[in-house]
């Protein structure tokens, strides 16, 4: 039988009770005695805290979005690194980028302690191996051109600290996300995002408010960076990969809404453009064939708005 604790030093660990995420929430001290109605109401009320915590971190989020965008525009990649819930949230956000923005699967990557198997089966003990964070990044070819977002709700995860330290060491962009004040747990990074959601209703269960705030922050980082990279026109995902019926319908509606293209003509354009909404729009608006539209888009750094303007069209 495998010893799950063979890699752990079983001497008494540091007391983490001072960490904000480990403290007891006075609102829920009688949690097990509440009625179902009171339980649900309490959770709904407490889940207002993540939004407030994320709003308080707007300056750091702006800084992070701009820095990530600069790196991606220069050929770098974005990596999320975490263990447990934090790592799973990073994997989730990374996995959504290709279908939403037609980005290369390598552009945004989620790195989870324990690998893909840890998505379904908890491997939280692996977070205690500091060298593993660096090793996992190295195995993916992480370089000085890339960005790392290290996610550690309590700010003490050795796996994440090791990865962030390595990113700083090689002059990559190192961004930290945690849910405790900096004086409680410092992290090696250039941009430090603190989402202070407070003690959890279920003491120490950071999959709750801390996880919600983290998901919100990751949504902001990836989506805003993709907007800055020109993968959005207005509020439409014009780089959507039309890979199923739902997404094909969305692509057709985008063509109709932006250029008044009916569905039959839209289907023809999407077939000719190999499913690219941007190319289809340029074909229709500028009277180009697919090859010329693709060439124009490349010349304009994949920015649809400037490509349209260059052929005298001002779709808004």
Curated annotation (Swiss-Prot):
GO terms for biological process: amino sugar catabolic process; N-acetylmuramic acid catabolic process; peptidoglycan turnover. The active site is at 96 (proton donor), 127. InterPro entries: Etherase_MurQ, Glucokinase_regulatory_CS, MURQ/GCKR, SIS_dom, SIS_dom_sf. Residues 68-231 form the SIS domain. Its EC number is 4.2.1.126. GO terms for molecular function: carbohydrate derivative binding; carbon-oxygen lyase activity; ether hydrolase activity. Pathway: Amino-sugar metabolism; N-acetylmuramate degradation. The keyword Lyase applies. Keywords: Carbohydrate metabolism, Lyase. It catalyses: N-acetyl-D-muramate 6-phosphate + H2O = N-acetyl-D-glucosamine 6-phosphate + (R)-lactate. Pfam families: GKRP_SIS_N. A lyase-type mechanism (elimination/hydration) is suggested for the cleavage of the lactyl ether bond of MurNAc 6-phosphate, with the formation of an alpha,beta-unsaturated aldehyde intermediate with (E)-stereochemistry, followed by the syn addition of water to give product. Specifically catalyzes the cleavage of the D-lactyl ether substituent of MurNAc 6-phosphate, producing GlcNAc 6-phosphate and D-lactate. Belongs to the GCKR-like family. MurNAc-6-P etherase subfamily. Homodimer. This is N-acetylmuramic acid 6-phosphate etherase. It comes from Prochlorococcus marinus (strain MIT 9303). The gene is murQ.
